[in-house]
From Swiss-Prot:
The chain crosses the membrane at residues 59-79, 146-166, 180-200, 216-236, 240-260, 316-336, 359-379, 398-418, 421-441, 449-469, 481-501. It comes from Aspergillus flavus (strain ATCC 200026 / FGSC A1120 / IAM 13836 / NRRL 3357 / JCM 12722 / SRRC 167). Disruption phenotype: Decreases the production of ustiloxin B. This is Efflux pump ustT. One of its GO terms (molecular function) is transmembrane transporter activity.
Amino acid sequence: MSGTSPPTPKDHITMVDHDYSDCSEDVSLIGADREHRRSSTPDGLYQHKINRHYNPLYIAVVASLTFLITDIAGQIIVAPRLAIFEHIICKAYYTQVSGAAGTGMGDCKVEPVQSELALINGWREMFDNIPGTSYTLDRFGRKKVLLIAMVGCLLSDIWVGVVTWFPDTFPLRAVWFSGIWQLIGGGGASISSMAFAMIADSCPADLRTTAFSQVHAAVLVAELVSVPAGAALANFNPWIPVFGAAIFMVLGILFAYVVVPDVRPAGSKREGGSDGDFLSSAQESHPTWLMSIHHRWRKIVDEFRKDSSWIRDVNVLLIMASFFVCQLGRMISGITLQYAAAKFHWKFDKASLLVSLRAGVNLFVLAAIIPALSYILVKRFKLNDVVKDKRITQINGVCLIIGSFVMFLAASPGTLVFGQTVFALGFAFSVTARSFLTGMVDPMHIGTVFTGVTTMLYGGLVIGSPMLAKTLQWGLQLGGIWVGLPFLLAAVLFTLALGAISAARSY
């Protein structure tokens, strides 16, 4: 992942621990008067509150590896899980149609089977991501929350495995309850929020986009390798990658426990003391459990009021709104598999190659195109970092819109592949949008804002999952070109996201 580094001297990574005050991008547009008194340097520039015991490169690598391990465990079961779901639905459908068990299954690509598959998978994704709407988790230590969230994700996958292992005991729709386990720690939302906040705390402006890109590159490597690998293993037995993913997740939890530093959020130690202090005092002065909970809730509300000045900035709100539909880019992966399998009668192992294609293009974008564009816009066009990030985000948005629309119109496998390629060129939308947003927010509010961003991402997923599932059902019922109706919806939503980014003023 070193190929994602922009053309800046490598010693910048080690120098930031000693000289970070020259990063003028950290002059915030938000909360300037209040925060200036607490976190500015003598020359008036904001100084990011970071843990200087850890090198930014180390934090970026650890966050990327944690993402890689977690995402491999999640991605390797994408195709096998769809195959298992489809088999259970198909068997039940033809048993009901024939009126007798034991008769052979027919074509599993028929509309009733695929509609039920879209319904179950779409609502499962929604319920899985409802626990992701947490705000205050990062106040209790990033490492602790990260570990608990990973355990919750593991238990969630185990529940799905139990339901599908005993289809005669549990109805398949019982997989919708897998989200309950992700209440433990906040699920994938907390993993994402903690990793990105750790990077934002430790990396200066000129390295931030690269660090974010490394995390996204880890996700892409997982997709590039694990999705087709899981599909290939599913040809032998779909349960092989399912059990393998659980083992890999356990290893990931052990890795995070040993390697991830126990870093508190930037600015967590305030004038009134650290979170640990107020928790201790709560236990001393309020011995009952109920009163302790009440004290913690009041403290959370007070802290939110202190940190909520960024809510009044319209430009920040516009950027955050664009993240609401950004997660659709990730969710389209599962839709693409089922769409290609249903429309062109592909097996899931063949359809999974589309995911690998997208991941390969994404890696090229992060390794070559983004650094090149950044260099050209800064050196040749003399744009500052904030404007540069905005322009690249707009380009990414256009690619997402065009790619989604082409996939909607795809009448042949070649057109679908072309649309997927164009769509993949815009995958870095969230990378540069995060950097764009970070450059406009006071460092003291980074943890809070990034938790808000993650909430917007998963809020979009919670609403978008059943929405795309329903549109896929409609498309399958209408047939023809309308099978790709979810991609038309995605194109419309990405257009709204591009409009929000364009409307945000960059100073």
